[in-house]
Each structure stands twice: as C-alpha cells, then as structure tokens.
Amino acid sequence: MSKITKSPVLYIVLLVVGVWVAVNLFLTNAYQSIRTEEGLELIKSDSLVSVRIVDRDQRVDLELATPYKNHGTKVQFNYVSQRATEIVNAVNKAKIKDGFTDEVPAPSVWGSIISMLLPIAAIGLFLWFMAGPQAAGGRGIAQFSRMRSRLVSKEMPKVRFTDVAGADEAVEELQEIKDFLSDPDKYRKLGARIPKGVLLFGPPGTGKTLLARAVAGEAGVPFFSISGSDFVEMFVGVGASRVRDLFEQAKQNSPSIIFIDEIDAVGRRRGSGFGGGHDEREQTLNQLLVEMDGFDVKTNIILIAATNRSDVLDSALLRPGRFDRHVAIDAPNLQGRLKILQVHARTKPVSKSVDLEVLARKTPGFTGADLANVLNEAALLTARSNAQIIDDRALDEAVDRVMAGPQRRSRVMTDHEKLVTAYHEAGHALTAAAMRYSDPVTKVTILPRSRALGYTMVMPVQDRYSVTRNELLDKLAYAMGGRAAEELVFHDPTTGASNDIEKATSIARKMVTEFGLSKDLGAVKFGNAHNETLMGVGQMTARDYSEVTAERIDVQVRALIQNAHDEAWEVISNNRNLLDDLALNLLEKETLNQDEIAEIFKGVRKLPERHVWQSAPNREPSNKPPVKYSAMGPDSEVTAKSPKRTSNRRRLPSARRPRKDSETQE
C-alpha cells in the first residue's frame, strides 16, 4: 500500500476529482426545490421579483420578495413536458417586478472538460493498478499468470507411508522416488535414469492423493501441490503461463516434487470435444509437454500426477520421457482392506470383540475411502445411540448404509407389499444358494433402503479378478430369481424386478459382445468404445456391425435371459417349501444373517451341472486335467511339471484382463 501512496498518479487522480467536485458545487445554485403545485401558487401571488424558465432542465427558478416557509427567497420547481404550456401561460399572467426570462443554457466548458477527463483518469488509474505486482502490491493482471500452488512446509501435518495401507506396490514405487531425491548419486553411478513423471491412476477413493501426501511427508523436499483445474482461468494464455511459473518455482527449490491432482482436467486428449487446436486447454497441455521435455537430468524435479480417467489422457503425455512410470491403484484385496481398517480403527474406540478380518471379508470391492466411511458411519451411529464403544452391530449397520443407503423408516408398506417383497428377496437368495458357482448368501432383508424395498447380499469368499462363464450364468439366474418367485407364487409380477432385469441384460449383452461367450457369434468384440467427451457425455460406443449382426446379438442376449429365467424357475419350483420358509422368517425378523440363511437352506436341491462349454462342434474338450497347483501362499510354485514345448517359438505373455467393477455380484 505504501507504493500506491508514493506514486504521483494517485495524487493527479485525486486532484481531478477534487476540481470536478468544486466546479459542480460552484455551479450549483442556492435555489431550494418545492412542489410544482406550490410553484404555481407562488406565480399567481404578488411576491414575485423575477422568474427564469430553464427549458432544457424543465425547471422554473423563482425569486421572491419575502421568504417562502423555510425555503428562503429563492425556490425552484420542475415540471413535465405536458404542462409546459400551462407554466408559460401562468408566467405571462403573473405580476413580476423584474420580469421573466426564458433560456436554454449552454453547456459549461469546465463541466465538459471535467466530465471528459474524469473517466479517462479512472481508466488510467485502473490500468496502472492492474499493470503488475510491482506497481500494485502483487494484485495485478500479471498475478493471474502466477501459479497458486501450495508449498507443503515442514510445519504442516505430515502423512507417512506407514499411514497408507492396502497399496504396497504403489508405496514401493514411490519409495524409490523418495530415495532418489535424497540420494541421487546412488542411481547415477549405476547409469540409472529416474523417471521424470509418475502417474497414479485408479478408481476414485483408492488413495491416490493420500499417497502423494505421504510422499510429501517422507521426501523432506519442497512439495508443490496443485489441481489440474487451477490451470484454467477466464483469461486466454493464463494456463500456459502458470505452467511455466510452476516449473520455474520448482527449479528454484530443486530438488522438489510437483503434484498435479486430477490432471485429466488439463491433460485430456487433444482434438476431442469443442475448441479445436486453439482450445485453451490444448495450449496449457502443450506448455506442460514442453516443460517436461525440458527437464535436466540433474535438475532433480519429479512430477507426480493423479487421475481417475487415464483413458482420456493425451498419448504424448503418457509416453516414456514424460510420465515414465504408470502406477495402478485399484481397490484393495482382503489383506489390504484389513490393513486399512486397522489404520482407521486406531483413532476410534472399537470393541475388542470386533473382528476386523470378518469386516474386511464383508466388504469386497470397497475402496479405502469406502472403508473409512464405514468406520465413520459406525462412530456416528454409536454416538447417536449414546454408546461409548463401536460394536459389531454398529459396523454391520454402517456397511449396509454405505452399500444400500440409510433405512427408509418413513416408507410404510402394506401387508401385501411386504409379502411380495419377502418372496422376491427369498427368490434371489434361494436361486443363489442352489447354483453351483454362485457366492454364498450373507444377508437378506426386507427393510427399505434408499430406492430398494429390500435386498439380498451375495458376497464372494475371496477376492477374484476374473469370472468364468458358469459364474456369469449363475449371476443371471440369481438376478431373475426374484421375478420367477413373483410369477410362481402370485401369478402377477411387479415392477420391483426392473433393476434386476437391467443388471441381467447388461451382463448378458457383455457376454455376447465383449466376452465372446456366444457359440453363434464366437469370440468377437462387437462395438467400438470411444472415450472422447462430447456434450458432457463420457464413453460412447459406436456400432461397427450390420443390422443383421445386431439382430443376432439381440437374439443371443434374449436367449441367455430366457435360459436364466428357466433355471431360476426350476430352482424355485423344486424348493418351494424352502422359499415359503425363508419368506416367513423374513416377515417375522425382517433381516436374516448368513448363519440363519444357511440353516434354512440346509436341504436345498442344487441345480444340475450344465453341459461342458464347447465353442464349436469340432472343438472337443480335453479330458486331461490341468497341472496341480499348491495353494500354500503367493510365492508357491507349480508342483507338477508342465509338458515340454516342442516348438522353439517364443510364447507371448497372457493378456488376461482383470474383472471390471460392473461385473461384481451385488
């Protein structure tokens, strides 16, 4: 502020404003305003000394011989244009001592000069004020181009690698980055080149940002944290300027780490969407690519970025030499979930009777954020009940709230609706229990939650990363179990199976178009997925097959759904007594756990084994069993020797794809 007060520009502006105010005060007359009717009455009186009609302002100035009320001897009033003739006639008839004048005043020269100079001076002051941080104390336009990154200082609360659980591989990769920054000569002596960039990608809630914070806590070097959206501003060119400023700050504080969260906001593939080559984001991305190429080997600057959408990033950004290392951070496995629960349970009064491993088995597919939310919900429920210790009951309710939403106690169902819901959920549970490749049923309830009137929980015993054809067929049958029960018992199905039909149709279509599990169409991928964003729509699938093929796909999907419906009908028909028993227990208790369900289904009649999969008539399956595999641990090896290969051709590695989240049983 002292720089502003010392500048002569401020005093010049103040002088101009002062002169303008003084001139206006000088030119302002001392006439007091009165109402129009009062003015007309005064014109008719005998106390007028002089009258002046100002046509431009539609004003009449009166000078009186005696003061009028508290207004003195000089008064004025205004009139509308429609009464101009009336005013003139009244003045002509009036008895005025010095007569009257009618004038159109010329504009004031000083007023014109002041009115012209004042806006010019105001604009000049604004431009000077916004010219740069040196002239305006760092609040100018140039400040927009500066990077508002957060520099993590030593005094800030730190996260260590010990606080990160369930991502051991990612921690190992980032530990190497931290070691390089602290002892770069160790790697240079061996001719190793440390990666310039590390990309952390994975679904939301898996701990990407937490890992970056752990690097900041462990590295002991300046850590610049910024979001990808901070590069985009209202001014064109600001993004590229901020990229330059960010890397300049990092070079001045070398060795250092730059962390860009949600980099897909600025690193999206060029040419997608609107804007073309002149899009502001593309300019920012180009500058980011240039800066990453300009890294010196001895600069000791490492860029870490996190994103949920690595599939939309520009290929030039992902190539070696920029983001050399891509670290996938997926949902944790059983041991990872257990470690995460143990980390979050440190600061909460969890009962000693709680087995966190059991809780970890109940939450397959949960991310670190989901598990943290489970314990937080359990703590809130415990506090709501005025208890002091978090027990199994609170944790079970917390899991249900995270998975299916809170209970809808205000949703009151009729007795018939409860009966239909009980049979619907019993149909799901019974079909899942009678399938040979389905996961065990762990919970059934008819308590409304969120949009569902009830739900059946089917949880895998262990983590799996691929799904077999029989498992998918069991999922289809289990999904149609509720609809089959309604048809069999009430002969009048309801709309409650709409979500089940949607899920079953999605699985069946993927089996035909993505997984190659249709004998008629074979192992062919139908449909080409595009990740370009257009009008707010994310991934789109373009149809690259004919109308005839589309009809065949629909026929195969319908056949899979029909077969699943038939299997569910057969299971429920063969076990009608168990269906009635489970529905009755649900109506009495509303919620059944795994032990209670297993007791009811003790005598369930399983569905016969399906025919062996044969993709073509000429491809007879082998009767020779696979080699034996020892399941002693993750480091165990195949115990039986595999047959020797007679060919010297190099065998390519397998490219089995992990199971998507949408393929998990719900």
Curated annotation (Swiss-Prot):
Topological region Cytoplasmic: 1-7, 130-666
SMART domains for this protein: AAA
InterPro entries registered for this protein in UniProt: AAA+_ATPase, AAA_lid_3, ATPase_AAA_core, ATPase_AAA_CS, FtsH, P-loop_NTPase, Peptidase_M41, Peptidase_M41-like
Keyword line: ATP-binding, Cell membrane, Hydrolase, Membrane, Metal-binding, Metalloprotease, Nucleotide-binding, Protease, Transmembrane, Transmembrane helix, Zinc
Transmembrane segments: 8-28, 109-129
Keyword Protease attached: yes
Region (Disordered): 612-666
Co-factor remark: Binds 1 zinc ion per subunit.
Requisite cofactors: Zn(2+)
Localization, UniProt: Cell membrane
Principal location class: membrane
Keyword ATP-binding tagged: yes
Bilayer topology term: Multi-pass membrane protein
Gene3D superfamilies (UniProt xref): 1.10.8.60, P-loop containing nucleotide triphosphate hydrolases (3.40.50.300), Peptidase M41 (1.20.58.760)
Listed GO CC annotations: plasma membrane
Active site: E425
GO MF annotations, alphabetized: ATP binding; ATP hydrolysis activity; ATP-dependent peptidase activity; metalloendopeptidase activity; zinc ion binding
Residue numbers binding Zn(2+): H424, H428, D500
Start-end of Basic residues biased regions: 642-659
The organism's place on the tree of life at top rank: Bacteria
EC number: 3.4.24.-
Physiological role: Acts as a processive, ATP-dependent zinc metallopeptidase for both cytoplasmic and membrane proteins. Plays a role in the quality control of integral membrane proteins.
Protein family according to the UniProt entry: In the central section; belongs to the AAA ATPase family. In the C-terminal section; belongs to the peptidase M41 family.
Protein name: ATP-dependent zinc metalloprotease FtsH
